[in-house]
């Protein structure tokens, strides 16, 4: 993955473009994932790295359901991402994807402005200040209108 990103960055930079890389939220953890995404290597190769720590994508641990704790879940990601950035010689900006859709698992809780604001606050509290992007695969304009207050 890194070799391709270095090649792509060289080509894109010479044409005046930037390169970003999206990675699973899990990749911020201090181990090498089976998916071939190694945070420090990708962060060193791109201009912006975008983790995807959607709370509903994390596994339940006993009674703990990450999708019911958006602040805590994204805070854990942000702290891990900050640690990985610190070990990267020339890290990219961290621009994180956040969940802006209703949880897809039982109890199918609704993600509204409060949950999105919690995710944004968690990123800021951990120093992930390179911005964020909202993921709403259904591109539901009503959802965006309902969370707009959380995006400032």
Show where each model-derived region lies.
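Glycine-rich tight-turn/loop motif centered on a GG-T
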Residues: 1, 63-70
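Alpha-helical scaffolding segments of alpha/beta enzyme cores, especially the outer helices
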Residues: 3-10, 14, 37, 41-44, ...
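Generic secondary-structure microfeatures
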Residues: 23-27, 38, 46, 53
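Short low-complexity, flexible loop/linker segments enriched in glycine and/or proline
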Residues: 33-38, 65-66, 146-150
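Substrate-binding cleft of secreted/luminal carbohydrate-active enzymes
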Residues: 46-60, 69-152
């Amino acid at each position: 993955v890194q070799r391709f990103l270095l090649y792509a960055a060289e080509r894109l930079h010479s044409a005046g473009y930037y390169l970003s890389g999206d990675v699973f939220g899990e990749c911020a953890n201090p181990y090498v994932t089976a998916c071939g995404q190694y945070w420090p290597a990708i962060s060193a190769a791109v201009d912006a790295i975008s983790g995807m720590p959607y709370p509903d994508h994390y596994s339940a641990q006993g009674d703990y359901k990450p999708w019911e704790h958006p602040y805590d879940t994204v805070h854990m990601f942000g702290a891990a991402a900050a640690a990985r950035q610190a070990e990267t010689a020339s890290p990219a900006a961290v621009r994180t994807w956040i969940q802006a859709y209703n949880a897809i698992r039982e109890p199918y809780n609704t993600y509204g402005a409060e949950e999105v604001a919690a995710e944004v606050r968690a990123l800021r509290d951990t120093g992930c200040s390179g911005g964020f992007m909202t993921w709403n695969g259904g591109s539901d304009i009503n959802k965006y209108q309902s969370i707009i207050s959380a995006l400032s």
